[in-house]
């Protein structure tokens, strides 16, 4: 069994509680707002939708949302020691990771992928919107696998993840061509571009490369997270 409804329910309540949903909503609301403003002020410019939804959406909004959600579904329990309650139950470590990962992906899709769809519909129409939505769905999966793994590796997962998002995804992947092959944002853009066929998207990798590397990153980071969680003792420390 790779999904535990009880763990999922507790994780979902925690993820959406304590006003966290408002925090998740801020970046996508900015994306939708910017798209609406540009639609009104620059309706004749065909280049801005792909730039805003692609560069800003996939390099800033999506990874930041996934970072906050992905590191919180397990990281908070590791930090405060309450993870020992999970480790003391008969629920397998693999099931804990996959369940929390699934919840993180679903919440990220709601707060990041759906806003990409809405912003795309506002900006141009269904073709670009569907492409961005599909790319955002795929990127949500890969990003959350990475950030859930990161939360098992360090108590400063949010800070480490923020450095990754800002430096690697936000700067290097958009300025250095070779860095794009290891950019989750560009994996999502490749999928979006294959559907939208918008030359302004400019993904740094091809569709096949994005799918293969995305699958490898997802499987590898989840496997590492399971192994790392399995090294915790019942005191919440690594063995």
Language model features with spans:
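Short cytoplasmic-facing helical segments at TM-TM junctions of multi-pass membrane proteins
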Residues: 81-87
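Secretory targeting signals
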Residues: 28-76, 80, 97-164, 201-215
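Short, hydrophobic secondary-structure boundary micro-motifs
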Residues: 23-25, 161-162, 237-238
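Transmembrane helix segments
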Residues: 34-43, 154-198
């Amino acid at each position: 069994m790779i999904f535990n409804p009880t763990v999922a329910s507790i994780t979902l309540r925690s993820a959406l509680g304590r006003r966290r949903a408002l925090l998740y909503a801020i970046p996508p609301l900015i994306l939708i707002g910017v798209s609406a403003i540009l639609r009104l002020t620059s309706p004749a410019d065909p280049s801005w939708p792909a730039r805003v939804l692609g560069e800003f959406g996939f390099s800033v909004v999506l990874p930041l949302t996934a970072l906050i959600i992905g590191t919180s579904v397990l990281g908070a329990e590791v930090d405060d020691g309450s993870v020992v309650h999970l480790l003391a139950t008969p629920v397998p470590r693999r099931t804990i990771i996959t369940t929390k990962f699934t919840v993180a992906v679903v919440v990220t899709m709601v707060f990041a992928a759906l806003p990409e769809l809405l912003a795309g519909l506002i900006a141009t129409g269904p073709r670009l919107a569907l492409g961005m939505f599909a790319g955002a769905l795929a990127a949500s999966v890969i990003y959350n696998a990475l950030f859930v793994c990161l939360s098992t590796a360090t108590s400063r997962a949010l800070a480490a993840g923020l450095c990754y998002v800002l430096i690697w995804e936000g700067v290097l992947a958009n300025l250095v061509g070779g860095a794009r092959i290891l950019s989750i944002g560009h994996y999502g853009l490749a999928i979006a571009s294959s559907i939208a066929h918008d030359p302004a998207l400019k993904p740094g990798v091809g569709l096949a490369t994005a799918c293969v590397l995305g699958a490898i990153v997802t499987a590898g980071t989840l496997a590492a997270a399971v192994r790392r969680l399995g090294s915790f003792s019942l005191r919440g420390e690594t063995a």
